[in-house]
């Protein structure tokens, strides 16, 4: 039974105790029999650690002295699991609410095929529970673009099939402990954004696969931990992460096509930004 296999859920917190409390409350309802939770506090100054220890005394907390970013914080959490590590790890954003059945389908898909290295749930917007945020990921190094399949579309049969995909979003994914260690964890030159794509590109380059598993479901309060979906800070971090990704993975010919495509993509993204911010669609 897949529910007998040990799983640790790693959650990163930075000055987001209310979000983390709601996430942990949803995890309390999960019906998987053999899982633990590790909260990594990334140098919070809002007394998150005290609040979480008081409300969830059974949850392990790793308190870091300073903010090491998404990659660094998650890597320190992962490193703290030894000795006696779990068989699987799930990295989960603190601004999420999980379905009670979300763990088993992710583990089960990893067990069906030794070539599967990452599994990802179907992710909805929390404020519109049937509106999809992630149903697979696309990476196009020829155009320098990354996007989610199904984003801002209402759920339907076309988003209910298990399938291979290009990358696992860092919002939530599951891997074997040994494989995450083998791939070296998240690259800490990516403080936030595109580190998840970078990891999946290495996974696929090694001949492994990334699978979207719609039987696993979670809901995402998109960018709540960063002050909103349209914050200036988020846009800057995303642009920097994408540049680092292209610098690391694109070949010389792809650099040429990216430069050609960039003005068009910039215009599309500006239009999309204003449309979503001011018209909501």
Label for each model-derived stretch:
Residues 87, 96-134, 139-141:
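Conserved donor NDP-sugar-binding/catalytic core segment of glycosyltransferases
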Residues 15, 27, 42-47, 68:
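Conserved short acidic donor-positioning loop in nucleotide-sugar-dependent glycosyltransferases
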Residues 231-281:
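Non-catalytic, C-terminal membrane-associated alpha-helical segments of glycosyltransferases
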Residues 49-84:
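Conserved donor nucleotide-binding strand/loop of the catalytic core
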Residues 25-34:
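Short, acidic, metal-binding catalytic loop of nucleotide-sugar glycosyltransferases
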Residues 139-166:
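Short, flexible, basic/aromatic active-site loop/helix in glycosyltransferases
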Residues 166-217:
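A short, conserved alpha-helix in the catalytic core of glycosyltransferases
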């Amino acid at each position: 039974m897949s529910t007998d296999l040990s799983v640790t859920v790693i959650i990163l917190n930075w000055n987001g105790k209310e979000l983390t409390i709601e996430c942990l409350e949803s995890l309390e309802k999960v019906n998987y029999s053999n899982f633990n939770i590790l909260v990594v506090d990334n140098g919070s100054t809002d007394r998150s650690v005290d609040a979480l220890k008081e409300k969830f005394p059974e949850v392990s907390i790793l308190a870091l002295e300073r903010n090491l970013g998404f990659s660094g914080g998650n890597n320190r959490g992962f490193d703290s699991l030894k000795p006696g590590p779990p068989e699987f790890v799930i990295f989960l954003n603190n601004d999420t609410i999980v379905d009670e059945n979300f763990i088993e389908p992710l583990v089960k898909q990893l067990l069906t095929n030794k070539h599967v290295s990452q599994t990802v749930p179907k992710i909805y917007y929390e404020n519109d529970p049937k509106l999809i945020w992630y149903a697979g990921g696309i990476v196009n190094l020829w155009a320098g673009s990354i996007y989610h399949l199904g984003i801002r579309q209402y759920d339907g049969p076309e988003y209910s099939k298990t399938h291979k995909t290009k990358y696992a979003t860092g919002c939530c994914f599951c891997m074997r402990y040994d494989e995450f260690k083998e791939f070296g964890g998240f690259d800490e030159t990516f403080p936030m954004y595109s580190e998840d794509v970078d990891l999946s590109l290495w996974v696929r380059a090694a001949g492994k696969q990334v699978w979207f598993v719609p039987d696993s479901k979670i809901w995402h309060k998109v960018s709540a931990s960063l002050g909103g979906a349209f914050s200036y800070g988020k846009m800057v971090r995303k642009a920097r992460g994408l540049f680092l990704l292209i610098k690391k993975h694109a070949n010389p010919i792809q650099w040429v096509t990216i430069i050609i495509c960039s003005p068009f993509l910039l215009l599309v993204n500006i239009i999309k930004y204003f449309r979503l911010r001011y018209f909501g669609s």
